Regions:
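Short, acidic, small-residue-rich periplasmic hinge/interaction motif at the N-terminus
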Residues: 15, 24-28, 57-61, 69-108, ...
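Short acidic/polar hinge/loop motifs at secondary-structure boundaries
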Residues: 43-45, 147-174
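A beta-strand signature from Gram-negative outer-membrane beta-barrel systems
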Residues: 75, 161-201
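Extracytoplasmic beta-strand/coil segments of soluble accessory domains associated
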Residues: 107-151
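Outer-membrane beta-barrel signature, preferentially recognizing the C-terminal barrel domain
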Residues: 140, 196-201, 291-308, 312, ...
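Flexible loop and strand-edge segments within Gram-negative outer membrane beta-barrel domains
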Residues: 234-240, 246-258, 269-348, 625
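C-terminal beta-signal and adjacent terminal beta-strands/loops
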Residues: 237-240, 490-492, 531, 576-583, ...
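Gram-negative outer-membrane beta-barrel transporters
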Residues: 488-490, 508-581
Length: 654
């Protein structure tokens, strides 16, 4: 029996360190296909086995056939000044494009990215927020299926509204091309949906959680579609570790209902995509560990739509897209007589393009508008309109250097304009070593809560401003790659809520600085074994007080050991977050202790003609006390088993 490649296997297509978007990857045996995204990353088509032939094609390039393997594929395009470029496969890894990790849980997907932290208010019932490089959760832009998840009320992106089944792989970019505006100071996290084979999944754990989902998917010559529906239930009774004691918390129950639909059509040189995602959450709000609440609850909903039409040209593409997001929340707490409702809607339309003028010049642009509406018992009814335009030019072989320059202009209806820029200069010293330097700016617009909260909203707020500089060096060898970087981020006009005596009000007062020294690396010890890891040292300061920034640890690190072979798949991962100040107080400061989060999973050899897959996992393997938000400890060690039954697995060999 041929060995099937796990559906988590990814690849990337690049051309002289530039990603190649919208290439088709076709399995010649099964006729199933995938399309690379705008960053050149693709998933291996479903049902692919070791030794299958994959055809890589895109207008403007000669079609190439390669043999599939379990090792993440890096496909590089070599340019020709006369003919269209020919696709060639390189055996080395790419230091410029670190292949994303995939995992069985939200924690695994997010924590596998360099410098990231996933902050949660306890278990599944708590809000989950991502942060990076010791920054705030509002400084990392999060996109799911190209849809901005930012809540315009508070500027945050609640990842607990996305069921694990929605999450395929994650990637982070530095927003060098300025495709994104407000809230992207620390970068942009792209969460890509996972294309699951048709079948059903059932997961259960010792904590009493139950997870059930059903999927259908298929692809034909010109189009593919997939749909899913499911439910996730957690009674919230699994004990947490706090002060070295196991404590069973009350009112942490969580019920989630979700559905999703995705269709992709390719016809000649046209691509079109449409997706719908929906989730409903009903959860208890347990409160702080030392001040529990057994009555509060929240019901929240999330509805997402994304549609795009893409025209591919030999030297680029033109893309038009429309996205819509609707998020609603009802919070009820009879103890404090609170019954609040919050509804936010946002619709965005944009046009983007990529054009390679010649072998040295590449031009990109991104233009669009968005409308945000909120209706809240605490904020009232408000609408914000914004439009934007960004443009960038990349120049290769510029006196031995590669140069990138980008600028962006955002215009808001409620406070004016914001201008940002981005520049990067890089050079190859040797075939295996390169250096680069970058600098740029970013901003964060005041949220509706900042502007209109009753009482205390301040409509005279200005946007926050940040400026960064970064120097890095990358080394690439036959089976490994490493990066060393130093980054400095300075921010001003930071919005801080201060007491007026009668109520709290936001003002632009604070300034801060962060210096981040980071090392990333990955090593392929064999075709089946890979080690990945990163570590960040962060030195931060609130310039108004001279103190270390709150919620900014000195150290963030992660490592992962992954092995795939003979139908088995296993990985062990560890994430470390250093201690951090929560509040400066007298006589002692309030702080969070260091966290060491560990996870182990084992995928057992599929049985019954590859139709039944079993995965065993252990979260918090070392059974450490975990707390990423002060007062909300997370679950102790837990065991889970996931069983999936996949349909239509038998494919005739040609």
């Amino acid at each position: 029996m041929a060995e099937e490649i796990p559906i988590s296997t990814t690849g990337i297509i690049v051309c002289q360190n530039e990603s190649v978007a919208f290439a088709t990857i076709l399995n010649n045996r099964t006729k199933l296909w995938e399309i690379s995204n705008e960053n050149g990353i693709f998933l291996i088509p479903q049902n692919t086995q070791n030794g299958d032939t994959l055809w890589i094609s895109r207008i403007g390039f000669e079609t190439l056939s390669i043999e599939s393997s379990q090792t993440p594929s890096i496909i590089e395009l070599n340019r020709s000044p006369i003919h269209f470029p020919e696709i060639q496969v390189q055996s080395k890894t790419s230091n410029q494009h670190i292949l994303p990790n995939s995992g069985s849980s939200r924690q695994e997907v997010i924590s596998g990215l360099s410098g990231t932290i996933l902050r949660t208010y306890g278990g599944n019932s708590g809000i989950a927020l991502a942060a990076m490089d010791g920054g705030r959760t509002v400084d990392l832009k999060v996109l799911f299926d190209e849809i901005d998840l930012t809540n315009p009320l508070n500027g945050m992106s609640d990842l607990s509204q996305l069921p694990n089944l929605f999450l395929g792989f994650a990637e982070i970019n530095e927003n060098l091309f300025l495709n994104n505006g407000t809230g992207s100071t620390d970068g942009v996290m792209h969460l890509n949906p996972w294309s699951h084979p048709p079948g059903v999944q059932l997961q259960t754990g010792l904590d009493g959680t139950q997870y059930f989902s059903g999927q259908i998917s298929n692809s034909w010559e010109d189009y593919s579609l997939s749909a899913t529906i499911g439910k996730n239930t957690d009674p919230g009774t699994h004990p947490v570790l706090y002060n070295s004691e196991l404590i069973e918390r009350k009112n942490q129950q969580f019920d989630q209902y979700f559905s999703g639909f995705h269709i992709e059509i390719k016809k000649n040189q046209w691509l079109s995509k449409l997706s719908l995602w929906n989730s409903i959450q009903e959860r208890g709000i347990s409160g702080l560990i030392w001040s529990p609440n057994i009555e509060a609850n929240r019901k929240d909903t999330l509805a997402l739509f994304s549609g795009s039409l893409i025209r591919i040209f030999p030297k680029g593409f033109l893309k038009s897209s429309l996205t819509y997001k609707k998020s609603g929340e009802n919070y009820f707490d009879p103890t404090f007589a609170i019954n609040s409702n919050h509804l936010s809607k946002s619709i965005s339309n944009k046009v983007s393009g990529f054009y390679q003028l010649n072998s040295k010049l590449i031009y990109r642009f991104n233009a669009g508008f968005a409308i945000e509406d909120v209706s809240s018992t605490d904020v009232g009814n408000h609408q914000r309109n914004r439009n934007y335009f960004s443009s960038s030019m990349s120049i290769s072989h510029f006196v031995g250097f590669k140069f990138l320059s980008a600028m962006r202009l955002d215009n808001y209806s409620d406070f004016g304009t914001a201008f940002t820029f981005s520049d990067k200069l890089s050079r190859n010293i040797f075939s295996w070593l390169s250096i680069s330097g970058a600098m740029g700016s970013s901003f964060r617009a005041p949220t509706f809560n900042d502007l209109y909260w009753n009482p205390g909203g301040n409509p005279k707020l200005n946007p926050e401003e940040s400026y960064y500089s970064k120097v890095s060096t990358q080394a690439t060898f036959s089976n490994s790659s490493f990066e060393l970087s130093i980054k400095n981020t300075d921010s001003k006009n930071l919005i801080v809520w201060k007491s007026t005596g009668d109520f709290w009000q936001p003002v632009n007062v604070n300034e801060s600085t962060r210096r981040i020294v980071g090392i990333n690396g990955q090593v392929f010890l064999s075709k089946k074994l890979i080690i990945q890891g990163s570590i960040r040292y962060i030195q931060s300061e609130d310039l108004s007080t001279g103190n270390q920034l709150r919620h900014s640890p000195n150290w963030i690190g992660n490592t992962k050991f992954g092995w795939k072979g003979s139908g088995w798949e296993t990985d062990f991962s560890m994430h470390y977050t250093g201690s951090q100040i929560v509040m400066y107080d007298y006589p002692n400061n309030v702080s969070l202790n260091k966290n060491i989060s560990t996870h182990f999973s084992l995928g057992i050899l599929p049985i019954l003609q590859n139709q039944i897959h079993i995965n065993l996992s252990i979260s918090n393997l070392l059974n450490k006390e975990l707390m990423t938000i002060y007062g909300y400890p997370e679950a102790s060690r837990n065991f889970k088993i996931n069983i999936s039954y996949q349909l239509n697995k038998k494919v005739k060999n040609e």
